[in-house]
Design a protein with these regions (language model features):
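Positively charged n-region of N-terminal signal peptides that target proteins for export
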Residues: 1-5
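Electrostatic cytochrome c docking/interface patches
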Residues: 17-33, 48, 150-177
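Detector for the c-type heme attachment site
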Residues: 41-47, 96, 111, 131-132, ...
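Electron-transfer interface patches adjacent to heme c in soluble/periplasmic c-type cytochromes
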Residues: 58-92, 113-123, 198-244
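Extended, well-folded interaction surfaces typified by the phenylalanyl-tRNA synthetase beta subunit core
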Residues: 137-149
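Bacterial N-terminal signal peptides
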Residues: 7-16
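Ligand-binding pocket scaffold of soluble enzyme catalytic domains
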Residues: 23-25, 88, 122, 129-133, ...
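The canonical Cys-X-X-Cys-His
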Residues: 28, 35-45, 91, 126, ...
Length: 248
């Protein structure tokens, strides 16, 4: 029993050391190609999959009649049509605060309200990953909005700590919220914004693409998301600033 306990302790220590030894780029590669899935929006899609040689080069995303027509911008290292000329801090500000270097506010479906909760280390890791994406010259159309965009999504974001991976519920909420933004696509939109307050995770968001139209599924254990919302207090934790006064 003592030997078994010692081996278990060694495994735990090795696991912790491996996690601590993870480089910023390794973490960024995991986030960018995994849970954050930058390419899902920013890489052009064809009926057979991602367009070859166009990683992160931008594409048409979605049009919500009377609300907005959204294009995912080119986020490759191309200095003319991408973000190659942006500083690291400008990229971080765009991701977590929804503001481009020229002061333009980034609108939906970019999940700024959730990305505000990305930890400092994770957002730096995403930048490290984006820095090694090859430049692609691809000028994208600008998104247009018939709904008013806020002057800001809240105060500047600073000092967001990592969520301990040992806290399974908190880390799971972080992955489903700020990092993976599962709830962004799986929550119905009301007046151009996801209805986190009343329909968290209830599905119903349409996606238009070469395949036709698909609709996000209800990922709650009940028809509506209120039981989960009450447990995790999502609106106050991760919703856009304008939604944080919603009852929770």
């Amino acid at each position: 029993m003592k030997i078994r306990g010692l081996l278990y302790a060694v495994v735990l220590i090795m696991g912790a050391s491996t996690s601590a030894a993870e480089t910023l780029l390794q973490r960024g590669d995991y986030l960018g190609n995994g849970i954050v899935a930058c390419g899902n929006c920013h890489t052009p899609q064809t009926p057979s999959g991602p367009a070859p040689g166009m990683e992160m080069a931008g594409q048409f995303l979605v049009e919500e009649k009377g609300l907005f027509k959204a294009f995912a911008p080119n986020i490759t290292q191309d200095k003319k049509t991408g973000i190659g000329g942006w500083t690291d801090q400008q990229i971080i500000t765009a991701i977590r605060e929804g503001k481009s270097p020229d002061g333009t506010i980034i609108g939906p479906p970019m999940p700024i309200g959730l990305y505000r909760g990305l930890s400092d280390r994770d957002v730096r890791a995403i930048v490290a990953y984006l820095r090694q994406v090859k430049p692609v010259n691809n000028e994208m159309e600008k998104s247009t909005y018939q709904i008013p965009l806020p002057p800001a999504y809240g105060p500047p974001v600073t000092n967001v700590p990592d969520i301990p991976q040992t806290d399974k519920i908190a880390y799971g909420a972080y992955l489903a919220g700020p990092a993976g933004h599962c709830i962004e696509c799986h929550t119905p939109f009301v007046k151009g914004r996801p209805d986190f307050a009343n329909q968290l995770g209830a599905g119903g968001f349409p996606f238009h693409g070469p395949w036709g139209v698909s609709v996000s599924a209800n990922i709650t254990p009940m028809p509506m998301a209120l039981p989960i919302m009450a447990t995790l207090n999502w609106p106050r934790s991760y919703a856009p600033a304008s939604d944080r006064t919603a009852p929770g």
